UniProtKB/Swiss-Prot annotation:
Oligomer status and interactors: Homodimer.
Regulation: Inactivated by zinc.
Essential cofactor(s): Mg(2+)
Superkingdom assignment: Eukaryota
Function: Catalyzes the final step of sucrose synthesis. Inactive with fructose 6-phosphate as substrate.
GO terms assigned for molecular function: magnesium ion binding; sucrose-phosphate phosphatase activity
Name of protein: Sucrose-phosphatase 2
Family: Belongs to the sucrose phosphatase family.
InterPro entries: HAD-like_sf, HAD-SF_hydro_IIB, HAD_sf, NTF2-like_dom_sf, SPP-like_dom, SPP_C, Sucrose_Phosphatase, Sucrose_phosphatase_pln/cyn
Catalytic activity: sucrose 6(F)-phosphate + H2O = sucrose + phosphate
Amino acid sequence: MDKLNGSARLMIVSDLDHTMVDHHDEENLSLLRFGALWESVYCQDSLLVFSTGRSPTLYMELRKEKPMLTPDITIMSVGTEITYGEEMVPDDGWVEYLNNKWDRNIVVEETANVSELKLQVESEQRPHKVSFYVDKKSAQEVIKSLSEKLEKRGLDVKIIYSGGQDLDVLPQGAGKGQALAYLLKKLSSCGKPPNNTLACGDSGNDAELFSIPGVHGVMVSNAQEELLQWYSENAKDNPKIIHATERCAAGIIQAIGHFKLGPNVSPRDVDFPYVKENPVKPTDAVVKFYVLYEKWRRAEVPKSDSVTQYFKNITHANGVIIHPAGLECSLHASIDALGSCYGDKQGKKYRAWVDRLVVSQCGSEGWLVRFNLWELEGDVWSCCLTSLALNAKPETPEGFVVTHIHKTWLKGYSSADEQSSKL
């Protein structure tokens, strides 16, 4: 949250499984489309929040499986844990708030003899969440009985049923909705209330997100039965909540456009040749640079001199690239080498994307852009911490020129091929 000096232009609060992440999309195209849009347009002045039922353990597993961005804020374990930044620093104030009228030991004791409840794996049992599986047929009866038992023991709890099988027992003050309300209150108290907030979900445990006053909401097209039922009973006349016609992250992009919250055309949906941006937008320039790089290697653009010439036009004739082991090469020589790599990743489930993009102004017409450059081929991941120097050149057809690229491997994500990423 500290990255912004003022209010976020847009705060997106999204569930992960079957909302931001489409597990039926093997190419992860909608997720990559959203990532390119966010890094290109929103990353510098907006906040990305992931709100998931997953525990930290399962959340980190998902990050190793899918090409996800690094969020500014992560809400996990059905709204019982709030953390900040890549380091995932916990919110101690939220922990203290949840301790009111909560005793995990009593919950475990009272549920031990309920035969219909089956404990989920140990990683899903958290300080303020006890999680079970329960058959859909007996769910409502179990919820009613368990609520009465825990109330008699002096606890104030919330029981959430979602996905047709998951039952979570939480403190009454917990949940995705309360966590979002807490964040909005915290941002407002710092004088930084978001200009707009978009909540995104697909299942019953996301309904609370749409109940927060002033929040826009999108149920993705593949939303589950329990969320659609909640919508028909509680929100069908609310113009701030829509049921998208697109699945998962594509539905989120659709909602940004529907509510007029900002641009919603992903750089991955923009055809080459690119239209000159005036003034230059460094984030957009970098994202498009690597989208085109990926498309060249996947043979998704024509094998044309116009593509390699574009790369040369936007790089300085004397510019250099320093590869992770320290090898220094001419940018133009690297582009010549790229020419021979056309289609070398065709049919190989290869993707390249940028994450954690940060821009620093250098003089009146220069920028230093830092980001993580990820490349994925099959199930092999590599990542370079990348710095790119870029200057405005309004007199040129593209409007800017890259003078320097410096790359180092992210620990644990190096490649045996030192120049595997070429640029």
